């Protein structure tokens, strides 16, 4: 969240709805309503939230819902598949998400490369995650740089989420 915004505070705290309802394994916490999640965030004193799987996907509906609980959208997770899919399609998906984030006044997108990821499969061992070749790394890095350019064009910051069970998890 912008340090020049309300109260001119340089640090503002938000929380992720995954602490109530898991995005990777949605049955974990599925009984929580979005209203309960946002109400409890507000009661705990948080000012923002990450986008979760129970949130409306229409910008005006999302803004209205967040305003009801005096919260702002701080960021959104976005899975990319640059190594597995056509770069052009993946970049189009990034731009669509970034455009949505701009519309709801969010400032950050959290990108994770999920090609071949095992993090959402409870039956897979983390050791079975994909290992990238040198050319895969070059493709991924180049694609992330292009995604960063898209984000910059919209005034959105790109943060990379190095999730366990994804191809970027290495011993190095």
Where is each model-derived feature located?
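Active-site mouth loops of central-metabolism enzymes
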Residues: 19-33, 52, 80-91, 129-137
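Active-site acidic/histidine proton-transfer and metal-coordination neighborhood
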Residues: 88-172
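Acidic (Asp/Glu)-rich catalytic clusters
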Residues: 3-10, 38-43, 56-75, 92-107, ...
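Hydrophobic faces of well-ordered beta-strands that scaffold small-molecule active sites
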Residues: 11-17, 49-51, 73-78, 107-111, ...
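Active-site-flanking structural segment that lines cofactor/substrate pockets
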Residues: 34, 39-41, 49-51
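N-terminal small/glycine-rich loop or linker at the start of catalytic domains
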Residues: 3-26, 72-80, 117-127
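Acidic-and-aromatic substrate-binding clefts and catalytic sites of carbohydrate-active enzymes
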Residues: 48-61, 80-92, 164-170
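Short, glycine/charged-enriched secondary-structure capping and boundary segments
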Residues: 28-30, 63-66, 123-126, 172
């Amino acid at each position: 969240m912008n340090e020049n915004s309300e109260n001119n505070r340089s640090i503002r705290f938000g929380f992720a709805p995954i602490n109530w309802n898991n995005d990777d394994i949605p049955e974990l916490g599925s009984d929580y309503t979005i209203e309960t999640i946002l109400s409890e965030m507000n009661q705990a004193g948080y000012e923002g939230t990450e986008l979760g799987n129970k949130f409306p996907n229409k910008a005006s509906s999302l803004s209205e819902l967040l305003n009801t609980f005096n919260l702002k959208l701080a960021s959104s997770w976005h899975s990319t598949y640059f190594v597995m899919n056509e770069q052009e399609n993946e970049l189009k998906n990034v731009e669509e998400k970034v455009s949505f984030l701009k519309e709801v006044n969010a400032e950050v997108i959290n990108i994770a490369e999920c090609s071949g990821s095992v993090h959402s499969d409870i039956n897979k061992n983390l050791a079975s995650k994909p290992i990238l070749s040198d050319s895969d790394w070059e493709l991924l890095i180049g694609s992330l740089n292009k995604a960063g350019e898209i984000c910059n064009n919209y005034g959105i910051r790109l943060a990379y989420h190095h999730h366990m069970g994804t191809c970027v998890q290495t011993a190095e």
